[in-house]
A protein has these predicted regions:
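Signal peptide processing junction and immediate N-terminal pro/mature segment
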Residues: 18-28
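Sequence context surrounding c-type heme c attachment/ligation sites in exported
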Residues: 26-33, 41, 53-62, 66, ...
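Short clusters of hydrophobic/aromatic residues that line enzyme substrate/ligand-binding pockets
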Residues: 47, 79, 184
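N-terminal post-signal-peptidase region of extra-cytosolic proteins
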Residues: 72-91, 112-115
Length: 193
């Protein structure tokens, strides 16, 4: 009986050592690859919309895209930043490596209210996700370049981008913001220092 208890304690001890060693290895890999990255980027550099970003990220700001011929807005954009991004940006005016920005794009509905004509988010169209990459980790992936990973996701599939080339599919909208690292920082009050 004593031998069985000693064997059981020995097996438990070895199991704990193996588990700690495995955790250390996983922790080292996560540190090397950046745990922020794993929430949004796979090993091949493919992006996806991060889980629970509405509750774990910080609201950066929102935009209303004016309707072409009528009052109100045709789209509303709501932008979130991964934890720590705002504080890091406010310290030195740069987005930190691994920062994730998620832009929700909604079709807007417009109607009269007691305060006047009002637009509100109606139907999700999709997401635009950007990941700061100051080290050029995915140079062979056409969705990465100019310091960022870039991808658009339709509302029905937050795991698979419809973007194929950031220069053709994404960057043209950001050209006016080239001088501020491709981001329209003036529209985001939390970034003001």
């Amino acid at each position: 009986m004593k031998a069985i208890v000693v064997a059981a304690v020995g097996i438990a001890g070895i199991s704990a050592i193996v588990a700690l060693a495995a955790y250390g290895q996983v922790d080292t890999i996560a540190s090397r690859n950046g745990s922020k990255w794993k929430a949004v980027v796979d090993d091949g550099g493919n992006l996806h919309v991060p889980d629970a970003y509405r509750t774990t990220y910080q609201l950066l700001g929102s935009w209303a895209v004016a309707a072409d011929q009528s009052q109100g807005s045709k789209e509303l954009h709501v932008v979130y930043a991964s934890p720590g991004t705002i504080d890091a940006y406010r310290k030195d005016g740069r987005f930190p490596d691994g920062a994730v920005l998620v832009k929700e794009v909604f079709e807007a509905a417009t109607g009269p209210m007691t305060t006047g004509t009002v637009s509100h988010a109606e139907t999700m169209k999709g997401w635009f996700v950007m990941v700061k990459d100051s080290k050029g980790r995915y140079a062979g992936n056409r969705l990465w370049g100019d310091g960022w990973g870039w991808s658009w996701f339709d509302a029905d599939n937050p795991s698979k981008t419809t973007s194929t080339d950031y220069k053709a599919d994404c960057q043209s909208c950001h050209v006016p913001a080239r001088g501020s690292d491709w981001i329209y920082v003036g529209g985001y009050p939390p970034l003001r220092r």
